[in-house]
Amino acid sequence: MAKSFNEITFKYKTNFINRVSLFVSIFLISTIGLSIFSLLNSGFRSEDAFLTNEDIFEIIKFTFVQSFFSVFLSLLLGFLGAKILFDIKSVLFKKIVISLTSIAFVLPTVVACIGLIKVWGGDGVLHLIRLSLNLNKNELTLYGLFGILLAHVFFNAPLFLRVFYNCFQIIPVNYLKNANQFNITGIRFFKLIEWPFIKETLPLLCGVVFLQCFTSFSLILMLGGGPSATTLEVAIYTAVRYDFDLKSAAVLASFQLFICLIVILFLDLFSSNKISNLQIKTNYLSYNLYKKSTFKNNIQKFIILLAYFLIIILPLIALVVSGLSLKIFEILKNQNTYIVFLNSIFIAIISSFITVSISWFISETRANIVMKYDNAFKDILMKKFINLSIMLYLAVPAIVLGTGLFILLKGFVSYNYFPILILIFSNVMLCLPFSVNIIQSHSIYLRRKHDKLCSSLGLRGWNRFIIIDFPAMKNVFGLSLGLCACLSLGDLSVIALFGSQNFQTIPWLIFQYMSTYRINEAASVSCLLIITCYLFFIFFSKMLGSKHVNN
């Protein structure tokens, strides 16, 4: 009796790849768990704490408030922007707006802060316009809650816009015709036509954005403005770096871990929902074909598009204009600049290749499980365990991870190497969810396409990978490497804890310039960082899959 197809196609991969994936998952979870335990253990054993219960309550309250309003404003602006974008007939205009707003997805947080300061800050474009019009009364202060909300909307409103716009694209034409025929508008149109197509993605999307805002660090650190606008993550950073108050850090970390784990469990409830609405269907059908444009609608469109211009597009323009100045030549003459860039590039390359390697093993393991239609309980358990190892970093503050590993390894690793190791580990954990999602769908596709052929030809193990899988996935590996390199180059979280004059990265150099109010120098370094990210992305894409760069 011939063996089943599953036995033939899986036996060459299951043993080795699944074991490697399981080992990596155990290592990641154990490392994060031990780092948390070491911080909590050291913290709760300490006797002194600078923060009172009232201080901790205020910090938690502000963290919730800024996260809630950030999600609400991003959702509102994203939804209205998607409706207006879908109303506009010009395909070219749609592509330009989507392209410009999508830059925020890969823009480092420190770079975005520079752009917002150049527009909304004390010497920004809007301040100069107010002065010229004698409107300098009741001036808004960028630093504080307003700046935090502005920065979070800068990053998250384009995400909501893209998702909602894709949802609107799959609304059947008949729905729009019938709505126009029966004069269904306003709230009724939203309830009957739009809501059924966005309700499945909304809880998951809001949960992810809330988690990002709740654990935000770089934006709060640079735009918070003081103790009155401090979140849990920044409070942990302050307690550890400036006061070395491990007890307060442990208490704050416990609250943050508990809240984030609850949110992750909430997300897991909706992870089984169908999210095909996230897939783009290029259908440039417009509501304008079926409803009349009025003066009121035109005013609403103008206001929303103006908000997008002031919050997202104008900061990008101001950053480029201010960064590409004579200051950039002074920075390039400084030898320390090259050392900082080499440090960042070295860490980004190492982190990217480690991340993509781990992602491939994990993706193949998950593909093995998906391809087995008769999954056993142990397969489901392994999949959940691997998913936990990928997503756990979202719940763990980077400062907690760095501090815990420092306490755990300070007797075993020299401090000269410690920042490098922590940066690489945190970058891998940061990039892993994105890299796995990029690679996994292609792994499953190749398994379904080539498994029978490889079984008949006897291609197994590394022979199959070199001959079949790698050539077909070069573009995916290039995309993943480029994205991981960009994310690694722009991360400020861990280096903010361990950065010093002896070891610096590009985000830390930008933060140092901003701390001394040298905004023009910070803008110039930010432009160099953007150029470096772009070159990395193009290099990896061209090197591995030039035919598929656009994909």
Predicted features by range, described:
Residues 1-14:
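Short, Lys/Arg-rich, polar N-terminal cytosolic tail immediately upstream
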Residues 3, 275-289, 369-377, 459, ...:
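Short cytosolic juxtamembrane segments of multi-pass membrane proteins
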Residues 14-45, 54-169, 197-222, 249-268, ...:
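Membrane-water interface segments at the C-terminal ends of transmembrane alpha-helices
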Residues 46-51, 127-139, 230-239, 326-336, ...:
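Short juxtamembrane loops and helix-capping segments at transmembrane helix boundaries
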Residues 171-198, 369-370, 452-473:
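Short helix-to-coil transition segments within interhelical loops
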Residues 179, 248-249, 454, 521-523:
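Solenoid-repeat scaffolds in large eukaryotic assemblies
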Residues 218-244, 492-519:
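Glycine-rich helix-loop "coupling/hinge" segments at transmembrane-helix boundaries
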Residues 270-304:
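Flexible interhelical linker loops that connect adjacent transmembrane helices
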